[in-house]
Amino acid sequence: MIIYILFSLLAAVIVHLVYKKQTGFKLKGKHIVVVGGSSGIGKELVYELLKENIASISVISRSLDKLRSVVDDCPSEVCTKSTPLNVGSLKSKIEIYSCDITNKIKVKETIAQIVSKNQGGKIDCLINCAGFAIPGYFIEQDEEIFEKTMQLDYFGSLYATKEVVPLMIENGGQGGHIVFVSSTCGLVGVPGYSTYCPSKFALRGLAETLRSELKPYKITFSVVYPPDTDTPGYQQENLTKPEETVAISGGGKAVSPLEVAKSIVSGIKNGDYHIAYDVPTKLCAVLSPGLTPFYFSFFDILLAPICRLVGIIAMNQNDAEVLKSWKKRNQLKK
């Protein structure tokens, strides 16, 4: 045990000295595209980004009414602020585009519109924030729900990224930054989310692959793992969420989308690859790193065995909740 601890400490020190974190992304003066920015986390993210003296922000969503509300609902303390880059209302920096992101042709056309409208055609940062979930029991859900979830949560982000990456490569050697909003369900499998977890795991896999593949082009990445967040989508989820899923998720407690949005902006500026809001999710990120940058630098090595132990305990607790709910349902059938 002592040898293991000493070895871990030595490895941690070496990693701390050798490992180089990706450079933080400067938002000031940048053109940002937010996919899925008409409600929830995405909408709050638009307002938080406006505080960073960005040049402009293009918001993509399917509902035109919701897109208009992004402009109309902009908080006065944000959208009436004067900045060196834009004296007057910051509302003028918001551009809205109605698009069904599950349609790759429409996505291609929308990105082309955004490029043509912005001088120079630059897109400096892409934030993929669209997604939804329909919780339920695997044996009771139709295959169409799995397909629909994957189409929006994964392919919607893929289509936008596929169009934006070539623009970033041609961005005069400046590269860019791409954010994928995954979920805590993209780090661990949660009973009741068999339609949702695979789509969020897929985003992690895409980001992990592109982080290395596009490194020569100075394109950096962040993956966000929000916990349950009090959004319109979350309220809809609760209509079909199994009892054990509620218990495993913390009894139905949800965090503010504003707080999650703030953590995303902070993570982008800090150069964080993994962006998590709460401690449990951060520990899950340490437990499931893949071939990605460290979360806590050398502390990742020290925390790994502890996180694994906590993970086993959590797994057993989840299994107990599932069994408890299963027995309860069977009793009601009698």
Swiss-Prot record:
Keywords: Endoplasmic reticulum, Lipid metabolism, NADP, Nucleotide-binding, Oxidoreductase, Signal, Sphingolipid metabolism. InterPro entries: KDSR-like, NAD(P)-bd_dom_sf, SDR_fam. Its EC number is 1.1.1.102. Residues 1-20 form the signal peptide. Transmembrane segments: none annotated. A motif (GXSXG) lies at residues 36-40. Pathway: Lipid metabolism; sphingolipid metabolism. The keyword Endoplasmic reticulum applies. NADP(+) binds at residues 196, 200. CDD domains: KDSR-like_SDR_c. The active site is at residues 182, 196, 200. GO terms for cellular component: endoplasmic reticulum membrane; lipid droplet. Its main location: endoplasmic reticulum. It catalyses: sphinganine + NADP(+) = 3-oxosphinganine + NADPH + H(+). One of its GO terms (molecular function) is NADPH binding. It is found in: Endoplasmic reticulum. Belongs to the short-chain dehydrogenases/reductases (SDR) family. PANTHER family: 3-KETODIHYDROSPHINGOSINE REDUCTASE. Catalyzes the reduction of 3'-oxosphinganine (3-ketodihydrosphingosine/KDS) to sphinganine (dihydrosphingosine/DHS), the second step of de novo sphingolipid biosynthesis. This is 3-ketodihydrosphingosine reductase.
